[in-house]
Amino acid sequence: MPFLLAIDQGTTSSRAIVFDHEGQPIARAQKDLVQYFPGDGWVEHDATAIWEDSLAVAREALDRADVAAHAISAIGLTNQRETAVLWERASGQPVHNAIVWQDRRTAALCRELKAQGHEALVRRKTGLLIDPYFSATKIGWMLDHDPVLRRRAEAGELAFGTVESWLLYKLTGGAVHASDATNAARTLLFDIRANRWDEDLLALFRIPAALLPRVVDNAGRFGETLPGLFGAPIPITGMAGDQHAAMVGQGCFTRGMIKSTYGTGAFALLNIGQTFVESRNQLLTTLAYRLNGQSTYALEGSIFVAGAAVQWLRDGLRAISSAAETQVLAEAVADTGGCYMVPAFTGLGAPYWDPEARGAILGLTRDTSLEQVARAALEAQGYQTRDLLDAMAADSGTKPLALRVDGGMVANDWVCQFLADITGIAVERPRVIETTALGAAALAGLGAGVFASPADLGGQWHRDRLFTPHMPASRRESLYAGWVQAVRRVASDLR
């Protein structure tokens, strides 16, 4: 029986899952990743830890599955997107901590570039906005703050990659420097219509072309692991950014299908087919996936803080000891008593794009309880999702009939039901909620010939539970109106 190994490198942890050829998880391993916060709004990772942890969990998953390397048909890689890694080609060692997608240190530069009128060019070529979220200004910051690094980059001595590119480089012993199209599309340097690195964008952000990896499809033969890593070489045949892998894992291969993933942040992607559509409502246009050289596009809404709000209750306030407690707390009260949490810890994402916004809990009274604050943290995920779905409906002209959800938060039944209630559409939770890893494994299977076509991948999806809206429309709109007012008080551009 062929097995597939998915390595899923995320913002707060690295995990690996062994799947069988029917898409069922056989064994998994996970290790938390330390985050560093060296300045206000700054977020970094140790790139060496990313590599070492990813290798360790892959080995552990194989051990737990009792599967030898020669029985693994292929490896699929998926990763936190936009996070920028810079390393020395000769040694394979990082020259700076990885700057994480959440990092806002380049907000002033982004404002300056917008004021100079560059955003129209960026939107036309990349489908993105000028924002610290994306990789280009992170790379530029590293080069500008160490003149030696800029000189070495221009001389071709350094390499840039998003996390999947970094892992591919390390797994192959430096033999392959490549990035998949979905990750390249998140850098602000890649023209997603022409499918190439763009000279105008490289000049705008002052990024030397010598840094850049070769761009490949999401499925194909990219290289193989060094024999010593797992006991035998394993082909690496699938790569995608985490949200794109989740789209594959959710079987969203038809125009109009939509998925939303709830992890540290939350990300909704709507399949819009093979025609580029520029958003009029502050969404991103991005690659859903690229197979056999053919691009499929998506509208994306990015929420910077989802599960991180619950982590803050646990680790920051120490109000709870585990994320699972939030469901019990939320169910213990009938409502939040007018309390809203706007979790803009690192600014607001779509559709506001306000890097200066900061989080707030509004509507507090002497009677506000921990249960109500916990419920407000969970409700915020529904309100933010409603923001995105309304913008998508305005751009596409149609409202989706169902929302496929995944990620750690959707194990919480209360969250899924509130999502259905506040959006007014059905919410579908799959049997395998680790759909990011499943999508990476499926792409690896496609690249290795285990699956013949994307249609075979869609057959891997099975529904666990359907949540339908129960909330009266008047109540839904009243709650959402309160959210809109809360955001208005937090967002710097709306005050």
Swiss-Prot record:
Keywords tagged on the record: ATP-binding, Glycerol metabolism, Kinase, Nucleotide-binding, Transferase
Residues annotated to bind sn-glycerol 3-phosphate: T11, R81, E82, Y133, D242
Annotated positions binding ADP: T11, R15, T264, G307, G408, N412
InterPro entries in the record: ATPase_NBD, Carb_kinase_FGGY, Carb_kinase_FGGY_CS, FGGY_C, FGGY_N, Glycerol_kin
CDD domains: FGGY_EcGK_like
Binding site for glycerol: R81, E82, Y133, D242, Q243
An example Gene Ontology biological process: glycerol catabolic process
Catalytic activity, reaction form: glycerol + ATP = sn-glycerol 3-phosphate + ADP + H(+)
Top-rank lineage group of the source organism: Bacteria
Positions of ATP binding: T11, T12, S13, T264, G307, Q311, G408
HAMAP family: Glycerol_kin (MF_00186)
PANTHER family: GLYCEROL KINASE, SUGAR KINASE
Known function: Key enzyme in the regulation of glycerol uptake and metabolism. Catalyzes the phosphorylation of glycerol to yield sn-glycerol 3-phosphate.
UniProt protein name: Glycerol kinase
Species this protein is from: Rhodospirillum rubrum (strain ATCC 11170 / ATH 1.1.1 / DSM 467 / LMG 4362 / NCIMB 8255 / S1)
